[in-house]
Amino acid sequence: MSGTLLAFDFGTKSIGVAVGQRITGTARPLPAIKAQDGTPDWNIIERLLKEWQPDEIIVGLPLNMDGTEQPLTARARKFANRIHGRFGVDVKLHDERLSTVEARSGLFEQGGYRALNKGKVDSASAVIILESYFEQGY
């Protein structure tokens, strides 16, 4: 086991991506993947898996603040199931509440409104999801 994990912040237009190391508990953003109504270019995901060879994949699970599911929750689950089905890699879902808010805040502090492009926000959210996963001791 390499200790490498990939995280995805699922969205219908853009899917944020991050790579992280279990040993350091840190993650960094990778370029976001464009999606057509939630469907990514599966060839890009396959290339990411070949390049990084993750032990597992973490997919952010969008929930309402009270923990109930929202319309995007089922689609994120479906995305996670498709990754597992296509590539046979372990996939776990992780609560992503407020990850986008935190990502926007951090990017804004770094570069103002110009830093808030959609792909950067989505991949920064994926970093937050993965680091949160590490912080919970996984």
UniProtKB/Swiss-Prot annotation:
Gene3D superfamilies: YqgF/RNase H-like domain (3.30.420.140). Its EC number is 3.1.-.-. GO terms for molecular function: nuclease activity. Pfam families: RuvX. GO terms for cellular component: cytosol. It comes from the Bacteria. NCBIfam families: RNAse_H_YqgF. PANTHER family: POLYNUCLEOTIDYL TRANSFERASE, RIBONUCLEASE H-LIKE SUPERFAMILY PROTEIN. This is Putative pre-16S rRNA nuclease.
